[in-house]
Amino acid sequence: MTDLLRAAGAVVWRGEESRPEVAVIHRPAYDDWTFPKGKLKTGEHVIAGALREVHEETGMTVRLGRALPPVHYFSRGRLKRVDYWAGRMVADDGFVPGEEVDELFWLPAEEARARLTYEWDAGLLRALAVAPLESVPLVLVRHGSAGARNEWAGEDALRPLDPEGASQAARLATALPAYRPEVLMSSPSARCVETLVPYGGGIKVEPLLSEESQDPHKTPVLVGDLTVAAAVCSHGKVLPALIHALSGKDVHLRKGAFAVLHRLDGRVVSVERYTT
């Protein structure tokens, strides 16, 4: 639906996972109590939009956990979709009351449910409670668009991103901060390395992620042994088998897309797929 309004936000939490507190905001224009969210800017990645809106409305930086069910409702005659995530507060620049948001309270889930204006927000709290809040994200990325293989005269491993692929890499760089990866790993192919470069340096090149050297046993062990948040870029011929080996899920990614595998004690508890 081309007329669909898009927005994004998060249920921001802090404290112990067994008894978290969530951030509830008051919007004077609507006189409602809700969770931080807002409309996406033109061309903005939905994950980047969620990070931005949370920071603008609360002053907080969050690390996103698993996605929560999206909310749909009509706003001024147009259907609106709001994507939400669980978001652990990792930094706080301080809440500044303003015209859009004038109050913020940290509340236990039970008190937050009683304070919230909308039933769909109460539904987000219920979704928050049914699965672990803390997880270790593994972001598996298919390299961006790199033109046609048969139109490249040089060595295939040197084939670079094309303009569309560069744009995809730039959008990926706005989404990856949500997961705060400590390890960046890539196939040696230029198009894979270039897909991660806009996010940051320190990329470890790993031949087992290449099309030529992938191994159905060694490659999943290599990636599965990562115990911290990580982003890994590889190929369309490598990633489906890798994702299945790690999660048991059949996930196919178009160029520039990525899957987020949320892991708890080494076990994948949730798989999400996003485009750029």
Which ranges hold each PLM region?
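Generic beta-sheet signal
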Residues: L138-V139, L226-S234
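Conserved Nudix-box catalytic region and its N-terminal flanking loop in Nudix hydrolases
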Residues: S18-T61, N150-P160
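Short, well-ordered beta-strand micro-motif
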Residues: V12, H26, Y84-R88, W106, ...
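Unchanged
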Residues: L40-R66, P70-L124
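N-terminal strand-loop-strand
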Residues: M1-F35, L138-H143
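Nudix hydrolase/Nudix homology domain
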Residues: D31-D32, G94-W152, G236
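Active-site-proximal alpha-helix that buttresses catalytic centers in soluble enzyme cores
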Residues: G38, G49, E134-D215, K249-L253, ...
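Domain-level recognition of soluble alpha/beta enzyme cores
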Residues: S247-E272
